[in-house]
Amino acid sequence: MLNLERLGLINFKNVYRNLPVAKLIEEAVKREEGVLVNNGAFNVYTGKYTGRSPNDKFIVDEPEVHEDIWWENNKPISVEKFEKLYNRLIAYLQNRDLFIFDGFVGADPQYRVSIRVITEYAYQSLMARQLFIRPTEKELQNFVPEYTLIAAPRFKAIPEIDGVNSEAFIILSFTKKLIIIGGTQYGGEIKKSIFTLMNYLMPKKGVLSMHCSANIGKDGDTALFFGLSGTGKTTLSADPERFLIGDDEHGWSERGIFNFEGGCYAKCINLSREKEPQIWDSIRFGAILENVVYDEATRELDYTSDKITENTRAAYPIDFIPGAVQSGIGGHPKTIIFLTADAFGVLPPIAKLTKEQAMYYFLSGYTSKLAGTERGITEPQATFSTCFGAPFLPLPPMVYAKMLGEKIEKYDTKVFLVNTGWSGGPYGIGKRINLEYTRKMVSAALKGELDKVEFTKDPIFNLNIPASCPGVPSEILNPRNTWKDKEEYDKTAKRLAQRFIENFQKYKEVSEEIKNAGPKG
């Protein structure tokens, strides 16, 4: 018995639960939700929402959770508004087919959460199946979901009545254990609202939830890669020498680390087999593509086209990646890499961090966005997203930072800051740091080869820079050396250091040791 009545779901037509991949694709094709393309993947156009819509995400302001939530970063909606909108959504689903995926989030059985995803589109059920953790036949028999997510993209909110900002909404009710999504078809909303849920639940169980990728070496040494979109998390953790645990969301418990998911959600703009063979080969029958341009006649994909969006995506199960760690579990991390793409060209390509510096750079969550070049603006913008994942944090940042500091200390984890951005000048003048060099620096950090080298202190950013690194020209390790105009470097570096200092002023409760670990300006 699915017991959908307890959710108020009645008078629905057919219910399709945990259908196999081929059947879900068959249903999706039949309903014209998308098309099969020449590599066997299922490609959908998601309409006007081709990315997440942070302005349309709300947390229900319930007395039981009010004190916990970081309201500076999360939008509240009243219980009354939520219930009215929920009842309209339930009424909308009457007389419609429903697709259900029952499964789990969290690969460690001790911490896993059972979820039910109810969708009106077959392909979104396939997406949930490929991204989350799939249950065994036995687990399905007595399955009871703790949390339920309902996604109905064709149901649109009315902002004036519903107290939301547009026709789209993503609303989490932690007390009712419900997530509802409407008006947007973008698959990332399903994935990231479940991540937000885990960011709420896990710290309460003593588990640090993290927006990072993870892999493991042949000797069983685990590494984590933190970084915002476009910094190289997926690319650098897909290393043929190492085995992928997961590409995006993990927990760190007393037992080690574990993937929250059972799949990957990779960016595919400009994807090529040469640069990213693992991702390229994973896009096949069973994978879902979002908003990739294709030729109607030949069904050939054009990964270079950003005609619909630059945020083109592929969702596929992790077992499509050769050598992926099937259990989704690893030991305590030996090394953590914070990735940043600095378009000002002033941060070193690699630096070793102390525990205090690790907390400082974790709370800062820095990268830079390139301004729209079509308007002739080439000045990059500094972006700070706390804990490298601000949009998904329901609790205050210090909750996560404190846990990170404690765990780094307890398990003696080494932390490095790696800049995958520009060198020799800012964006437009300098050039992007060679990916091969970045790979060599990451490899040296993971193998402990940087333990043996000398370090110099960067006077502006207060960072320890290695004097040498195997396979990397020493002159690029100190960014000042790569600039022709040293005065211009000093000015630019001080300007960015000042941005760090200004951004960090909001963390009033941070100790002096952590404050002093940051740039000096």
From Swiss-Prot:
Residues reported in the UniProt entry to bind Mn(2+): K192, H211, D248
Reactions catalysed according to its record: oxaloacetate + ATP = phosphoenolpyruvate + ADP + CO2
Enzyme Commission identifier(s): 4.1.1.49
Co-factor requirement: Mn(2+)
One GO location term (cellular component): cytosol
Pathway(s) where this gene product acts: Carbohydrate biosynthesis; gluconeogenesis
Enzyme class: lyase
Top-level taxon: Bacteria
UniProt: ATP binding residues: 192, 211, 227-235, 276, 313, 432-433, 438
Gene3D superfamilies: 3.90.228.20, Phosphoenolpyruvate Carboxykinase, domain 1 (3.40.449.10), Phosphoenolpyruvate Carboxykinase, domain 2 (2.170.8.10)
Keywords: ATP-binding, Cytoplasm, Decarboxylase, Gluconeogenesis, Lyase, Manganese, Metal-binding, Nucleotide-binding
A Pfam family the protein falls into: PEPCK_ATP
UniProt keyword Metal-binding present: yes
Annotated cofactor note: Binds 1 Mn(2+) ion per subunit.
NCBIfam families named in the record: pckA, PRK09344.1-2, PRK09344.1-3
Protein name (Swiss-Prot/TrEMBL): Phosphoenolpyruvate carboxykinase (ATP)
Organism: Caldanaerobacter subterraneus subsp. tengcongensis (strain DSM 15242 / JCM 11007 / NBRC 100824 / MB4) (Thermoanaerobacter tengcongensis)
